Amino acid sequence: MRHRHFLKLFSAGAIVLSVLARPALANPVVVFDLKSGQILQHQDAFKRWYPASLSKLMTAYVTFRAIAAGEIQLDSPIKVTKHSAAEPPSKMGFKPGSVMRLDNALKMMLVKSANDIAMAVGENVGGSQAAFAERMNAEAVRLGMNGTHFVNPNGLYSPDQYTTARDLAVLVMAIRREFPQYAPWFSIEGLAVGKKAIPNYNLLIGRYPGADGMKTGFVCPSGFNMIGSATRNGRTLVAVVLGEKSAVSRAETAAKLLDQGFDAPVAGSTTVAILAPYGDTTSSNDMSDEICKKKKPHEQSEAPPAVAKDAPKSPYQEKLDHVPTLVAVGLGGATGPAPKAILDQGGQEYADVPIPTWRPDKPQPAGTGPKVAGADAQGDQSAKTAN
């Protein structure tokens, strides 16, 4: 990936924060070294928080483990049910009965943060939403995510779906260490579905030197959540940021924390695994009034500002300096075996069905949108947008 060094580096006399100097931040934060697990900064790491679409990281992790166990393959069919199709945005908008490959479904879930596709993945891998949530919770217990509970695979609000910044750090380490082959999916700049370009909601990707992941999340009670990662000189740092007030501010905070981490001469001695619980660990914070009350609909969206004048004037993030690389995804091409959970329920294998018509959230006028070269809907093909 081509990067321009957007970051204005701190001067030699700048103060470098560490675990001994707490950041002046309002909400939960954990910054850590991926390889060692050493924590560079943390604040309210055990505070219960609504994960929103960060839940999709656990959905991905459960699915990666199902692939490793032989329950499903990357080219296995994921069928959109009536239930999954009815999930609210952010969504792809495919009709019930639509079928896609699992790998394409996961990319839509991670890049577009599509709630309908996350639910479809959960239903197909687990057999039902409830059964998949049980698997999510079982993995959380196994990993030691003691402040976490899930009821759905997409992160739509429920008072019973919660996590902590520390637990999310544990999950990130499990994903990146156990399944490095999927790491490129977390740094995809955008998707191409036919002629439609879908950008990644993660404003670090392509805008912050070394950025390579991972996920954003938003519901009104949670505020704007983000897990951002970056690698420089072989060192990967991760920032977990919860409860920011906008898509822009969460990216700016994550970038600032990552930059402070890379500038730190050494990491702290405390690791994610041994960090002892502290503070309030039982009550959940609800930001609904602060984030969504008296806000216009577009201000409640997961998506960042769409127009240039709304772009932040920040030393940490700027516009892309290159044409985004899009990964082509779509329906069809599912030639692999049906998921084990579906077969166990007596379902029949469905593969390579006719491609249904794509129903976007908002119809696109004919002749508009970027042209996409090499936009094959199957597998890991990438394409460049052309003006």
Each PLM stretch: what is its role?
Residues 1-11:
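Bacterial N-terminal signal peptides that target proteins for export
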Residues 2, 16-166, 173-176:
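Active-site-adjacent loops and short helices of periplasmic peptidoglycan-processing enzymes
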Residues 146-149, 153, 157-162, 166-387:
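Domain-terminus/edge residues, biased toward the C-terminal soluble/receptor-binding domains
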Residues 10-12, 34, 192, 208:
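Short, positively charged
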